[in-house]
């Protein structure tokens, strides 16, 4: 039995790449895709924090030139592949198509999982180092540490925290099951309840993945990312780009199930002794055809360039929620507005 999971971080990067406000323009995407063998560099302008506002008019306007850099794209290569022996499916209860589909599914799932982990690693590496206003949360190790008593507040508080860092636009939340559990409990307290806790997560888009893991003592982890600040570049090998056909080898550019990214494919056949493929069922295949299916892609997960992340906040904030004791329910805060009406509950009459 196979159960493909959700790969929310990967899907998020792909979605943001294709968005109208993407940091990756079509020209860069096209140039990068065909760049195998070359170094891809993106011209960027550094942050200048020394701008002076004067209070006296003058006939002389001073120079203040920007400084630029060439940001080098760092690639990671991902490869998968499998083989098929067509004759092995003659007089076989499992058809060629069924086995091919299952092999394609398991390898594609493994690739999606690896890419999702790569996307999360990019978020982890580029999370904010500074918070201009952390409210009343602990911020250590570049992570917001949320006490279990404040679990119901962090999804609402992440908006003003991001806004204080000058990121006021829509937020995406890349998170795990612990955060989904929290959202579902908040959803139970709507507009007709004592307190409308749905406002805590309203206006955000959630991207769920099992690859956002909790550290020891944590019950939920998420990355908050402002819309329009990330993207992903891909490139394929030169023969795939050329769609080469030679010596019974075929290269192409394809899209795999579950992964909306172009990858390079390589197909060829050979003839040889395939009798050991699946034991006794193929012992007669001493001279048979074998098919080879290979797929590869170079991937670079990008976050908006920041020349001084120790002073200027990145558009990503990581937060962790402390774990409750086992079988301890999530407690919703109760706000008593007329405490004075109860003995010992407020100011004396």
Stretches found by the model and what they are:
Residues 1-73, 216-217, 312-316, 320-349:
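N-terminal "assembly arms/tails" that initiate or stabilize quaternary assembly
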Residues 39-41, 72-74, 79-81, 136-138, ...:
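Ser/Thr- (and often Asn-) enriched beta-sheet segments in non-cytosolic proteins
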């Amino acid at each position: 039995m196979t159960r493909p999971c959700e790969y929310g971080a990967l899907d998020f990067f792909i979605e943001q790449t294709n968005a109208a406000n993407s940091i990756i323009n079509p020209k860069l995407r096209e140039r990068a895709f065909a760049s195998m063998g070359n170094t891809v560099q993106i011209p960027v302008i550094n942050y200048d924090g020394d701008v002076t506002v004067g209070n006296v008019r003058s006939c002389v306007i001073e120079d203040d030139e920007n400084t630029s850099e060439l940001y080098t794209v760092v690639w990671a290569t991902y490869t998968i592949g499998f083989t098929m022996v067509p004759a092995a499916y003659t007089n076989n209860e499992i058809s060629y198509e069924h086995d091919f589909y299952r092999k394609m599914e398991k390898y594609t799932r493994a690739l999606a999982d690896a890419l999702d982990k790569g996307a999360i690693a990019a978020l982890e590496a580029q999370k904010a180092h500074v918070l201009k206003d952390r409210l009343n949360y602990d911020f250590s190790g570049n992570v917001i540490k949320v006490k279990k008593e404040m679990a119901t507040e962090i999804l609402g508080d992440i908006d003003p925290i991001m806004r204080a860092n000058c990121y006021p636009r829509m937020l995406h939340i890349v998170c795990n099951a612990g955060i989904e559990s929290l959202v579902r409990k908040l959803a139970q307290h709507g507009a007709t309840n004592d307190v409308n806790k749905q406002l805590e997560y309203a206006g955000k888009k959630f991207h769920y993945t099992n690859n956002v893991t909790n550290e020891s003592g944590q019950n939920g982890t998420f990355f908050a990312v402002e819309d329009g600040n990330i993207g992903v570049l891909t490139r394929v090998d030169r023969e795939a780009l050329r769609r080469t056909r030679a010596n019974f080898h075929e290269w192409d550019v394809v899209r795999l199930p579950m992964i909306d990214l172009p990858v390079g494919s390589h197909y060829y056949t050979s003839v040889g002794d395939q009798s050991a493929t699946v034991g006794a069922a193929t012992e007669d295949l001493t001279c048979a055809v074998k098919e080879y299916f290979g797929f590869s892609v170079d991937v670079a997960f990008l976050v908006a360039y920041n020349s001084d992340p120790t002073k200027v906040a990145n558009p990503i904030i990581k937060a962790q929620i402390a774990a409750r004791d086992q079988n301890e329910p999530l407690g919703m805060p109760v706000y008593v507005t007329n405490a004075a009406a109860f003995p010992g509950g407020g100011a004396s009459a």
